[in-house]
Amino acid sequence: MKHYKWAKIICLLIAIGLTKACDYDLSFSPAQTQDIRFSSDTVYLDTIFTSIGSSTYNLRIYNQADHNIKIGSIRLDQGSDSQFRLNVDGMHGQDFNDIEVLANDSIYVFIETTVDIKDYAANAPEFLYNDQLLVDEQTVELITLVKDAIFLYPKREDGFKEMIPLGTDEEGNAFGIEGFYLEDNELIFTNERPYVIYGYAGVPSEKTVRFEAGARIHFHDNSGLIAAESSSVHVLGEQSADAEMQEGEVIFEGDRLEPFFENIPGQWGAIWLTAGSTNHIFRHATIKNASVGILMDYNDETENPTLVLEQTQIHNSSAVGLWAKTGHVRAVNSIFGNAGNASFFGNIGGSYEFTHCTFANYWNRSFRSTPAVILNDYVPISETEDFVMPLEKAVFANCIIDGNQTVEFGVEQKGDQELSFSLDHTALRFSTADETIYENPYYDFSSSTLYPKLILNKQTAFHQPSTNDFRISQESEVIGLGKSTHAASVPVDLNGVDRTNLPDLGAFQHLIFEKED
């Protein structure tokens, strides 16, 4: 009986509480102009490509009053014709009425847009699209810049996307990668409009794709460029008069234009130079935010380099900047920057020649256990077997090999033939208390064959390495340490500055920067 009595009392208390709660009624007054404050009077949505949706941006509407208010209307000035989309306090639409906001509280308005530039400015390369968000009698400007672009993507037939064949598996089944081969009229990329590529754009056999000065190439996620057997890639950028505008540079990057994505690695796949492709030239090119900047499967077995890099920069690769498998590469005035693993991986041997190049890995997005530069002669093909090819040559002349690790140069041999490399008038970051590392004979820094002129553990004083600015300042300890005969073959630096008189190491002659307070 006692339990029954307590149950009756509890039920009675709950009933009284519910009755009082129902008596408590929230009241809302019509919002006055002075009650409302906005987090911004203008919402700038970052640049988008035509017909591609933007990221989501937010505006906060504050109730500054000590009482509850009801906003009569939140709507777009252009109404149903507007290309902006709204989400107000969790509700989608373009016109909202009687929105309640508690005293000293706020609500969010989320804003997106998709604009087809042809609906507003036919043949224009870009168009500034705007509308107004009307909040009762107050307004907030909505602005976005829309860029026209050329879109290239795989065809879809019967629900299947076009594929580029890569080979067959052990059972004889064909496999490939989502992509398409460029048509003859698509093999020249100009600077008239940016290009947006979905999937892998394939260069057909016996064809050459040409990227002219100022071309802008944007790859979607899991997309890239692939060169088939006997095909070539020619990137023919020019020295830019304006270092910020980079009007002569050919730039390969992702298709997200918002500032947040400017230095985000791994936004797209790779520039893939398959085995049998030949005569690749990259001049005044910037390759940024890929998984692998350039993936090179093999060399073309000729006396000439299969890949020539001149004034080329590879930045923010989530895996490797330049990954050359038995490659034949010649590079001058080039930068191999931040990467999740190696800036340059000379894998399964090959032949490499670098003059006035900067290898600098200041990766800070995750733990990195690999050095900036790796040379080896093998690849595992099973748990017990390696495929081996000799490292015929790897010359680093007037270069910098640096980073935020203590050891930025790795050499490993599995085959019988000794690896052939030399660091001549080259600065190297290599400092470790682990004496076992020096048991590797390739780290004998007294060897005049491997290290004819090694400059060890000097302060390079890069300007802003975390943001890919590898110019050296007046405080650098590698100023004037280059060999003049090496510099004579590359008489100007990456910015076109003469270096023949007193060459600094790396891709840049030093600059005098104003010290920040």
Question: What is each of the regions a protein language model found here?
Answer:
Residues M1-I10:
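Bacterial N-terminal signal peptides that target proteins for export
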Residues L18-A21:
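C-terminal motif of bacterial Sec signal peptides marking the signal peptidase cleavage site
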Residues S27-F28, I36-T47, I52-G53, F96-S106, ...:
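Beta-strand/loop edge motif enriched in small/polar residues
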Residues I61-N68:
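Asparagine-centered strand-capping/turn motif at beta-strand->loop junctions
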Residues D77-D95:
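Short, solvent-exposed loop/linker segments at beta-strand-coil boundaries, enriched for Pro/Gly
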